[in-house]
Amino acid sequence: ALSRQDSPNQIKVKREIITMEIKKELPEIFNEFGEMRKKSFLAAYEMKQKNIPFIGTFCTYFPQEIALAMGACVVGLCSTSDETIPDAEKDLPRNLCPLIKSSYGFAKTDKCPYFYFSDLIVGETTCDGKKKMYEYLGEFKPVYTMELPNSQSPAALELWRKEIIKFKEKLESFFDVTITEEDIRKQVRIMNEVRRALKEFYSLCKLEPVPMLGQDMFKILYGAAYKFNKETLPGEIRALVAKIKAEYEENPNKYPKAPRILVTGCPIGGGAEKCVKAIEANGGHVVCFENCSGAKSCDREVDEINPDVYEAIAERYLSIGCSVMTPNPNRLELLGRLIDEYHIDAVVEVTLQACHTYNVETLGIKRFVTEKKGIPYMAVETDYSTADIGQLNTRMAAFIEML
């Protein structure tokens, strides 16, 4: 209930909770976020009618604040369906990562509305497959590729800082706009607030027993990226957090105690969600996602007080612990911290077929998890098809029974 003693912020959050309670129950909210990628097609169309620029992206390394500062809408184009892979394989090798083939296939066949709406596609020199795929994408749309260093040294940071400035200048010339430092700093504050809100949300799974399924948590984390109004997003997330807490207080044993699983590895979504479902259908709870859709994209913030805003943005994004980095200590640091904070019983690493950097790095992750953290580890290599669902269930059941 609202109280006269409430601060304006408390009143705002409570009103959002009340509105949410009137309109929707938690399962409906989870499903709504899960369908956000599809539901936002219409919103994207309406924004295009207002001549709002669209920037299509493929990676967590993309410095969103720069594009948002010019008033653009930023949308992820990574596809997670095998629908267009046969079309992609007419141009690309079959033994290529399904994420790359799917993304290219949707662009080539014009089946992705977000690609259709995008005025400019921005990629980064992450993995070799993506770098070459961007060259072919340039046949369909204007593509700008940022030169991402593959290390996190001081020299690499300086290069990445320069690349971010070059990207700003590209946007200014391409769209005939001026991007001010004040606009960039405003978006830094907004995106930091989004990261804090998402972190508050997924941190709920530190509770034992868990207040939600990993499948539902992933729907929010994945769907939030397709909420175009970043200023209102933190309020929506925090209203959901409050609602989950309220329901948990009434019924903390909704989900019985079970082995607590952390999922790491490649970006997952769409077809790759089958791994999460297999874990939870066979007696485990996914309580944490370390990968691109989870903690990896929210854990670090941009330093708001650094006098050099480009250096601050460069530091934040370059510190992301992706397997394209050599060496990659930040992934181990984050992984170790999450294992401790979430009281993880086992780690499941999900890698996509032909994703060489993540597949090669599984040995180092296995050693870290089993030897340094002393908990079980399992690696799963998959793609976007449904052909291995039976095998996945069998493997997960045996692994979780062992726990």
Regions found by a protein language model. Give the residues of each.
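Redox- and metal-dependent alpha/beta enzyme cores, enriched for Fe-S-associated oxidoreductases
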Residues: I66-T80, D87-A88, C266-P327, R331-L334, ...
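Peripheral docking tails and interdomain loops at the edges
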Residues: I22, L363-L403
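A charged, amphipathic alpha-helical module
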Residues: I18-P53, I165, E169-V286, E290-C298, ...
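Structural motif
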Residues: F54, D119-L120, A346
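An N-terminal, globular interaction/scaffold subdomain
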Residues: F54-K111, T126, M133
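Acidic/His-rich segments in extracytoplasmic proteins that coordinate ligands and/or metal ions
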Residues: Y104-E172
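Short, Lys/Arg-enriched N-terminal segments with co-localized hydrophobic residues
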Residues: R4-T19
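A short, acidic, amphipathic alpha-helical segment used as a generic capping/interface helix at domain edges
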Residues: A107, T326-H343, E361-G364
